[in-house]
UniProtKB/Swiss-Prot annotation:
Homodimer. InterPro entries: Cyt_trans-like, Pantoate_ligase, Pantoate_ligase_C, Rossmann-like_a/b/a_fold. Pathway: Cofactor biosynthesis; (R)-pantothenate biosynthesis; (R)-pantothenate from (R)-pantoate and beta-alanine: step 1/1. ATP binds at residues 30-37, 147-150, 176, 184-187. GO terms for molecular function: ATP binding; pantoate-beta-alanine ligase activity. It catalyses: (R)-pantoate + beta-alanine + ATP = (R)-pantothenate + AMP + diphosphate + H(+). Belongs to the pantothenate synthetase family. Beta-alanine binds at Q61. The gene is panC. CDD domains: PanC. This is Pantothenate synthetase. The reaction proceeds by a bi uni uni bi ping pong mechanism. It holds the Pfam family Pantoate_ligase. It is found in: Cytoplasm.
């Protein structure tokens, strides 16, 4: 596996692959890899001739008071894991490389970013779309893989890719969970044992909602009420949002119909965790 840290070298490598007719699968990450990331890499490995993974803790998507400085970083560990998943190139640029002095350009997707995480994290998605657009232009992948756990992010990136005519196929991959149901996240390492146990309330609330839907419940207000009651029964949990939206446009719905997204953001202690479930009725 090759480690690349400069944009020029990364772009030159990608151009060489294109000249030789090889397809590139791309998995953008912020590092501190876990099984969810490795699942994306394996999907890319199965489908593409070459696999590139980026590791970049993007300062643009962190707001004031968020965990940019303490976000877990371990490039040696991540390199070992990426290589074990069959990755060809690990692209790990510095912030100075990505955003040199005088940088003033941003990508902003409207409407889809107004609710859910966009409401409580202003500027977050502008940071996400800016860095992903830059990475697409640098790596020049044929296919890019994203986890469904960040469902709003996935919808926003698909919208950006379509609107800007970027020649990349965006593939969403189902959430990877721990054996007890907790959605895998790099931020799970922050949790104390007690908080780790409390965090299971997210997947438990979604499972309760699924039971109700399978029993015929279609009223969104009723579903939100049950989810909220389930979460608030956990003393360490504080709800940021419980939302049920159309899965494509991320707009609120009153009745379940078609493909909908049930999305949660909950603080467990000091840590903000997200989870979601897509339902089709």
């Amino acid at each position: 596996m090759r480690l690349i840290e400069s944009i020029r070298e990364m772009t030159a490598w990608s151009r060489e692959q294109a000249r030789e007719g090889r397809t590139i699968g791309f998995v953008p990450t912020m590092g501190y890899l876990h099984e969810g990331h490795l699942t994306l890499m394996r999907r890319a490995r199965e489908a593409c001739d070459r696999v590139v993974v980026s590791i970049f803790v993007n300062p643009l998507q962190f707001g004031a008071g968020e965990d940019f400085a303490e976000y877990p970083r371990d490039l040696i560990r991540d390199s070992r894991l990426a290589e074990s998943a069959g990755v060809d190139v690990l692209f790990a640029p510095s912030a100075r490389e990505m955003y040199p002095k005088g940088y003033h350009t941003f990508v902003d997707v409207e409407r889809l970013t107004e609710g859910l995480c966009g409401a409580s994290r202003p500027g977050h998605f502008r940071g996400v779309t800016t860095v992903v657009c830059k990475l697409f232009n640098i790596v020049r992948p044929d296919v890019a893989y994203f986890g469904q756990k960040d469902a709003q992010q996935l919808a926003v990136i698909r919208r950006m890719t379509e609107d800007l005519n970027l020649p990349v196929s965006v593939v969403g991959v189902p959430i990877v969970r721990e054996a007890d149901g907790l959605a895998m996240s790099s931020r799970n390492v922050y949790l104390s044992p007690q908080e780790r146990q409390a965090a299971l309330v997210l997947s438990r609330a979604l499972a309760r909602a699924r039971e109700l839907i399978e029993g015929g419940e279609r009223d969104v207000a009723r579903l939100r009420q049950i989810i909220t009651e389930t979460i608030t029964a956990e003393p360490l949990a504080a709800i940021d949002y419980v939302s049920i939206v159309d899965n494509r446009f991320i707009q609120p719905v009153e009745t379940l119909a078609g493909e909908c997204l049930i999305a949660l953001a909950v603080r467990i202690g000091k840590r903000r965790l997200i989870d979601n479930m897509v339902v089709e009725v």
